[in-house]
């Protein structure tokens, strides 16, 4: 067992709950037979105490004690997505 707290970075895909959001974590894995790299997505429920993040925001989250049946991650740093060129 490690003593380090796990931190991950992902994109907010849902913020319709009070003090909660769903964050999609993407990772790249290699197919065991064909060797092609495949993108896999994991959705995690995250505690957002101040409701400060919206859909599309890139956030940093860390693991914590279980807060509910599905929530055991909390928001560390809310980061905004990079500005798109030509979009206001």
From Swiss-Prot:
GO cellular component, one term: cytosolic small ribosomal subunit
Gene Ontology BP terms: translation
MF terms in GO: rRNA binding; structural constituent of ribosome
Alphabetical UniProt keywords: Ribonucleoprotein, Ribosomal protein, RNA-binding, rRNA-binding
Superkingdom of the source species: Bacteria
PROSITE patterns: RIBOSOMAL_S17 (PS00056)
UniProt-listed InterPro entries: NA-bd_OB-fold, Ribosomal_uS17, Ribosomal_uS17_bact/chlr, Ribosomal_uS17_CS
SUPFAM superfamilies: Nucleic acid-binding proteins
Family assignment from sequence similarity: Belongs to the universal ribosomal protein uS17 family.
Function of the protein: One of the primary rRNA binding proteins, it binds specifically to the 5'-end of 16S ribosomal RNA.
HAMAP family: Ribosomal_uS17_B
Quaternary structure and partners: Part of the 30S ribosomal subunit.
Protein name in UniProt: Small ribosomal subunit protein uS17
